[in-house]
Amino acid sequence: MSLFPSLHLLLLIVMTASHTETENCEDIQNTCLVISCDSPGINGLPGKDGLDGAKGEKGEPGQGLIGLQGLPGMVGPQGSPGIPGLPGLKGQKGDSGIDPGNSLANLRSELDNIKKWLIFAQGKQVGKKLYLTNGKKMSFNGVKALCAQFQASVATPTNSRENQAIQELAGTEAFLGITDEYTEGQFVDLTGKRVRYQNWNDGEPNNADSAEHCVEILKDGKWNDIFCSSQLSAVCEFPA
C-alpha cells in the first residue's frame, strides 16, 4: 500500500481540527478567557515582588571571626569567707628563750654587787638608805642639782644612826637637805615636811645676818644654820 494517501489524510485531519478550534474561540470570545491557539510567545518582564512569607525556623549560628577582647569589668562585691585551710607543717625548733625571771634576778644580783662596792669604796648604808659622796664642795643649789641628776636627794637624817653615817662619810662640813628659806625658823626637808629629828649645836640656829637658811652638819655631827651660797661637801641619799 502506498504511504502518500495516508499522509494526505493526516494533513487533512490536522487542518480540519485547527479550523474547528478557531471557530470555537471566536464564538466564545465574549464569554471566556482567550486561549492562544497559536504557538507560545516571548516571555514577558518579571512581575512585582510578592508578599513576605511566614517567618522561618531559627538557623544554626554562623562561623564568624572572633571579636576583640572587651575591657575588664568592675570589681565585684567581696565574697563570703572561705573554709579554713588545713594546718601547716610543723616548723623548725626555735632557739631557747630567755627567762625574764632569771634575767631580773641576775640584774638584781649585779645591782647588789655594785651597791656593795659603792658602800665599801665611798658610801654608807643605814637601814633602807644609802649615802654617797664625791668629795667635792659646792653650794646648796649645786648639791641639789648633783643629787637630782642621779635620782637622789640631799642627805637628810631622820635619826641618830643616819646622822652618824653622814658625819662619818663626809668627814667635814656638808649640806643637809633641810632649810627654812620659806618660813623663818620652820625647818623642813626638801619635800616640804617639817623635820622631827634635830641635832643643833649650842646656840643654833641663830640666823646670823638674817640670811642663814640652809643647814650644815659639822665634823662632830652637830647642826648649824649657814648661808646657802657656802661651799660645802655634797652627800646624796639613795633608797637602798
UniProtKB/Swiss-Prot annotation:
The keyword Disulfide bond applies. Its main location: secreted. One of its GO terms (cellular component) is multivesicular body. One of its GO terms (biological process) is surfactant homeostasis. SMART domains: CLECT (SM00034). The modification Hydroxyproline is found at residues 46, 72, 81, 87. Residues 1-18 form the signal peptide. Keywords: Calcium, Coiled coil, Collagen, Complement activation lectin pathway, Complement pathway, Disulfide bond, Hydroxylation, Immunity, Innate immunity, Lectin, Mannose-binding, Repeat, Secreted, Signal. Interacts with MASP1 and MASP2. Interacts with MEP1A and MEP1B and may inhibit their catalytic activity. Forms oligomeric complexes of 2 or 3 homotrimers. This is Mannose-binding protein C. It comes from Sus scrofa. The lineage of its organism: Eukaryota, Metazoa, Chordata, Craniata, Vertebrata.
